[in-house]
């Protein structure tokens, strides 16, 4: 699975849930996307990668 596919999946999930709670959905999606990027790129855990564990 490519990185852009992971983004697409997470964004679709956020749009489906956005009717109930847009702000909570955006926060959850942001965390999911940042974790996916960190795991994929195996970045040094700094800043945006702090929740990659």
Curated annotation (Swiss-Prot):
GO BP term (any one): cytolysis by host of symbiont cells
Single GO MF descriptor: signaling receptor binding
Positions of modified residues (2,3-didehydrobutyrine): 29-30
Cross-link Lanthionine (Ser-Cys): where in chain: 34-38, 48-52
Keyword Secreted: yes
N-acetylalanine modified-residue sites: 24
Gene Ontology cellular-component terms listed: extracellular region
Key words, A-Z: Acetylation, Antibiotic, Antimicrobial, Bacteriocin, Lantibiotic, Secreted, Thioether bond
Maturation and modification: Maturation of lantibiotics involves the enzymatic conversion of Thr, and Ser into dehydrated AA and the formation of thioether bonds with cysteine. This is followed by membrane translocation and cleavage of the modified precursor.
Propeptide: 1-24
Beta-methyllanthionine (Thr-Cys) crosslink, residue number(s): 40-43, 42-45, 46-49
Positions carrying 2,3-didehydroalanine (Ser): 25, 50
Localization annotation: Secreted
Domain of life: Bacteria
Membrane spanning residue stretches: none
Role noted for this protein: Lanthionine-containing peptide antibiotic (lantibiotic) active on Gram-positive bacteria. The bactericidal activity of lantibiotics is based on depolarization of energized bacterial cytoplasmic membranes, initiated by the formation of aqueous transmembrane pores. Lacks antibacterial activity against Gram-negative bacteria.
Family classification: Belongs to the type A lantibiotic family.
Protein name from the UniProt record: Lantibiotic paenibacillin
UniProt source species: Paenibacillus polymyxa
């Amino acid at each position: 699975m490519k990185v852009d596919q992971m983004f697409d999946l997470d964004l679709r999930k956020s749009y489906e849930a956005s009717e109930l709670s847009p702000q909570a959905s955006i926060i959850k999606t942001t965390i999911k996307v940042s974790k996916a990027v960190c795991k994929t790129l195996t970045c040094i855990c700094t800043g945006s990668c702090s929740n990659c564990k």
